């Protein structure tokens, strides 16, 4: 079971990024496979925020185009949205206290807590996930 970080979704969509070709090929393989894929709500929001922002991408995606990508992904059988369960806060709190991290890594800690709570491995090009004890992190672009 894989939990996908926003950076891989952004790389898979934005053709101007150097990671695009590799990320797109990986994402298409995942979507056509049988492994259970979770996308956290926070990553959906990050995808929308970043891909539609003209200060980040020129040209940015229109809101309609960004939403169409998300709808397409969510229509795939192995894909589901992932929300925190009842044990999420305890796991997140422990990760933050164990690592002494918060600030810019708070969202990463939230994603790590989702993965630990629900049995996922985090797939991300962000190697900061290695900092969280007990979390399985895979960078599919480093292979």
Where are the model-predicted features located?
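Structured helix-beta-strand junction loops
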Residues: 33-34, 76-77, 118, 132
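Short, well-structured N-terminal submotif of metal-dependent ribonuclease cores
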Residues: 1-3, 7-39, 54-68, 143
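Acidic, PIN/NYN-like endoribonuclease modules and their adjacent C-terminal/linker elements
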Residues: 1, 112-143
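Acidic active-site catalytic centers that drive phospho-/nucleotidyl reactions
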Residues: 5, 108, 126
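Active-site neighborhoods of divalent-metal-dependent phosphate/nucleic-acid chemistry enzymes
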Residues: 60, 78-123
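Conserved beta-strand segments of alpha/beta enzyme cores
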Residues: 36, 78-80, 136
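Ligand-binding beta-strand-loop-alpha-helix segment within the catalytic cores
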Residues: 73
């Amino acid at each position: 079971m894989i939990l996908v970080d926003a950076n891989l979704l952004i790389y898979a969509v934005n053709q101007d990024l150097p990671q695009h070709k590799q990320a797109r090929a990986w994402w298409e393989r995942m979507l056509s496979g049988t492994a259970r894929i979770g996308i956290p709500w926070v990553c959906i929001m990050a995808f929308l925020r970043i891909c539609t922002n003209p200060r980040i991408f020129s040209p940015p995606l229109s809101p309609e185009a960004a939403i169409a990508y998300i709808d397409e992904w969510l229509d795939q059988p192995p894909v589901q949205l992932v929300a925190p369960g009842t044990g999420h806060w305890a796991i997140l709190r422990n990760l933050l206290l164990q690592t002494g991290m918060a600030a810019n890594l708070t969202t990463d800690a939230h994603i790590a807590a989702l993965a630990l709570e629900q049995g996922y491995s985090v797939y991300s090009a962000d190697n900061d996930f290695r900092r969280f004890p007990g979390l399985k992190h895979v960078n599919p672009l480093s292979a």
